[in-house]
Every structure is written in C-alpha cells, then in structure tokens.
A protein has these predicted regions:
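Extended, charged catalytic domains and RNA/DNA-binding interfaces, predominantly
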Residues: 2-177
Length: 177
C-alpha cells in the first residue's frame, strides 16, 4: 500500500495537480535615491573615518524553502508566497540593508528554482549604480545535514558566492543528502 500511495502522489506531482511553483517575481526596478545612499555613507564616515559598518542578512529564506513555504500557507494564517523579489524589495526598501544573501534550502532547490534564483539575484542587483550600489545581493543556499548524534550532526551552513556570473557559480546547489 505504501508503494501505491507513493506512486499516486508522485504522479500528482508530475502532473502539477497540487499547484504550480510560484515565479521569482520582479523586484521594484529602482534603486534608493542617491541622496539617501550618500547621507547614510556620510553619517557612517563622520563617526569613524577608517572603517565602514555594513548591515546585512546572511540567512534569508523565500517560499522556495519548504519551511518558509509551509509557514506562508493561508491555512496556517500565513500571507501566501513570498518570492525572491519580495526579499529583494524588503532588504532595499524596508530593512535598509547594505547586503543580503539568498539562502534557500539546497535540498528543496530544483534546477528550475536555482535558475530562477540566479536570475532574480541579478535583477535585484541591476537597479543600482554598479560603482556605488545601494544594495548588494549575494547568491547562496543553505546546506543542511542532520545526524543522529553530536558526532555526525553538522547542522546548517550558509554557502555564499561572490560572483553571480553564470560561468562562475555552480550549476546546482549541493545538498547533504
């Protein structure tokens, strides 16, 4: 019976009977006004001329991660899907971050999702002036390994890439399996 249930479920997934994957969305195609970016920079420089403090988030999930997807379901009082474009807009316009990293769970990232994430990261970085970006978005994923003891439990690790060029990033994220 387990095989029959699994076969029916797998067929349903293949035929898209359980819904469709949300698209990555399109971030608002504008950077912060340059006067705001300049004011922020000058405020930091007036405090300490030798160092610059940057604020960022290195652990951001969208609804491409299974846990974030489940918590976003309206049946659980969630708001619905939050694609990567929402994360970009939140980082830029709400959280006023200097940088952030997209770190959806590797084991949930299909080739289609990974391709969408890479395109969305590039779109998120586009509105800003290349020489003076208002926000830097890094491509990444979360590698998770769960063991049954402290000796073989490695937990969650965020993998980040400095480049977003297609020929400089992996073809797929590598999960722990």
């Amino acid at each position: 019976t387990a095989f029959i249930i699994f076969s029916i479920y797998t067929t349903g997934v293949y035929l898209d009977l359980y819904g469709e994957l949300e698209e990555p969305g399109i971030p608002i195609n504008s950077a912060l006004p340059s006067s705001l970016v300049e004011d922020k920079f000058l405020a930091q420089k007036s405090f300490n001329k030798e160092k610059q403090i940057l604020f960022g988030d290195t652990h951001v999930h969208t609804t491409y991660s299974t846990d974030a997807f489940l918590w976003s379901l309206p049946i659980l009082n969630g708001e619905g899907p939050h694609p990567i474009s929402d994360a970009c807009d939140f980082a830029r316009f709400c959280a006023n971050l200097d940088f952030w990293v997209s770190t959806d769970h590797a084991e949930a990232l299909t080739p289609r999702k990974w391709k969408s994430i890479k395109e969305a990261i590039r779109n998120c970085n586009n509105p800003a002036d290349e020489n003076e970006p208002d926000l830097v978005t890094f491509l990444g994923y979360e590698w998770t390994q769960v063991g049954d003891s402290a000796q073989n439990h490695y937990g969650h690790k965020n993998v980040m890439f400095l480049d977003i060029d297609e020929n400089k990033v992996p073809k797929r994220p590598i999960g722990a399996g």
